[in-house]
């Protein structure tokens, strides 16, 4: 019997993890959903189990302890993603670092033997190209491209792995693993939805930024969620497995966000412009904006989505492989690239856009 608590259960990835626990993990006997917003099933599937809903802030240790009491495992997915210029550093640290410390402490106090942490590729991505790299190839990356977001996630990952093999109050041991997904797409995603919104606001035309020849790692969210279930099963069956970190990818080809979005834009009757704004021009504009905002920053914090880091990201070739996950947790993508696309299309076709 395996009882599982999922933090960030109401979010993009959390919803898909709950779905796979319902449909593809018959050995799981209880599911608990912890989030700031009360969990409500957002995906179309038939539930096998009633989900126990726990509403609370990740900074509330008592709420975490209540949610984790007598569970077999915790999947810690809750986090703040902020890669814009001048992100909210206090919030990033409060949720990603201090929140993770609270999760670890609650696991130790409530005798939870399994903790699986959701990291991010931003915790290993720097100012260099990486063509099919492994975990060890990028282990000591510094500086990080998205310093604040990636830095807090990297610090939290380090805390989780350092907690491996710590004693529990019942005499047992806490085992920990960190899973590292890339940027994800699929049902619930807001990144491509934002691109659709930009096109809608511009009479159905998405103005390209750069030539789109960069190569970045993307994965279908359903496959990433399946990776968490594979890891959970491995750790549940082998109490000695832990202190590992690994990429969770699928077979989505490395490509630019423009290429990934093209099908979904066209499906809604939108199109990309034949011309594009050179990244060098965007870089200079962004540099000037950042300099002005930094001068103002002692008096007022100004944030905006475009940043120098985002421009550099759009110039890179950075993708990794998931051989380690194949070997250690017997993970293979549940959905092919074609199936992932077919599952994603209805969502992007119907996602609500502002008029």
What does each model-found stretch correspond to?
Residues 2-27:
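N-terminal Rossmann NAD(P)H-binding glycine-rich loop of SDR-like oxidoreductase domains
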Residues 47-98, 106:
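NAD(P)H-binding glycine-rich loop region in Rossmannoid oxidoreductase-like domains
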Residues 98-151, 168, 177:
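Conserved Rossmann-fold NAD(P)-dependent oxidoreductase catalytic core, especially the SDR/UDP-sugar
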Residues 167-232, 261-264:
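NAD(P)-dependent short-chain dehydrogenase/reductase
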Residues 184-186, 209-214, 243-254, 265-268, ...:
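Glycine-rich Rossmann NAD(P)(H)-binding loop
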Residues 221, 228, 245, 290-295, ...:
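Conserved C-terminal active-site "lid" loop/helix of NAD(P)H-dependent oxidoreductases
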Residues 234-304, 322, 343, 353-355:
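Mid/C-terminal beta-alpha module of Rossmann-like enzyme folds, strongest
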Residues 320-328, 332-355:
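Amphipathic terminal alpha-helices
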């Amino acid at each position: 019997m395996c009882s599982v608590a999922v933090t960030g259960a109401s979010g993009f990835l959390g919803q898909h993890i709950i779905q796979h626990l319902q449909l593809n993990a018959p050995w799981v006997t209880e599911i608990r959903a912890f989030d700031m917003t009360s969990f409500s099933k957002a995906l179309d599937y038939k539930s096998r189990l009633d989900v126990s809903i726990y509403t609370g802030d990740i900074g509330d240790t008592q709420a975490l302890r209540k949610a984790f009491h007598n569970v077999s495992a915790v999947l810690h997915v809750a986090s703040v993603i902020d890669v814009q210029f001048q992100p909210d550093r206090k919030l990033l640290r409060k949720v990603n670092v201090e929140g993770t410390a609270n999760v670890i402490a609650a696991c130790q106090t409530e005798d939870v033997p399994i903790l699986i942490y959701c990291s991010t590729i931003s915790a290993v991505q720097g100012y260099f190209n990486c063509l099919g790299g492994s975990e060890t190839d990028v282990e000591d990356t510094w500086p990080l491209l998205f310093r604040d977001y990636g830095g807090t996630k990297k610090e939290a990952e380090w805390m989780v792995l350092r907690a491996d093999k710590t004693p529990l109050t019942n005499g047992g041991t806490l085992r920990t693993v960190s899973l590292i997904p890339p940027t994800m797409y699929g049902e619930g995603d807001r990144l491509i939805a934002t691109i659709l919104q930009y096109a809608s606001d511009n009479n159905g035309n998405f103005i390209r930024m750069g030539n789109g020849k960069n190569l970045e790692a993307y994965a279908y969210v359903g496959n990433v969620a399946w990776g968490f279930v594979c890891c959970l099963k491995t750790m549940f069956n082998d109490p000695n497995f832990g202190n590992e970190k690994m990429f969770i990818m699928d077979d989505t080809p490395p490509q630019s966000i423009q290429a990934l979005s093209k099908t979904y834009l066209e499906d809604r009757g939108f199109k990309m412009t034949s011309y594009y704004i050179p990244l060098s021009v965007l870089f200079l504009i962004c540099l000037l904006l950042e300099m002005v905002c930094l001068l103002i920053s002692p008096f007022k914090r100004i944030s905006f989505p475009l940043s120098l880091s985002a421009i550099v990201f759009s110039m890179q070739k950075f993708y990794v492989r998931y051989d380690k996950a194949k070997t250690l947790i017997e993970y293979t993508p549940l959905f092919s690239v074609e199936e992932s696309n077919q599952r994603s299309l209805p969502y992007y076709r119907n996602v609500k856009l502002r008029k």
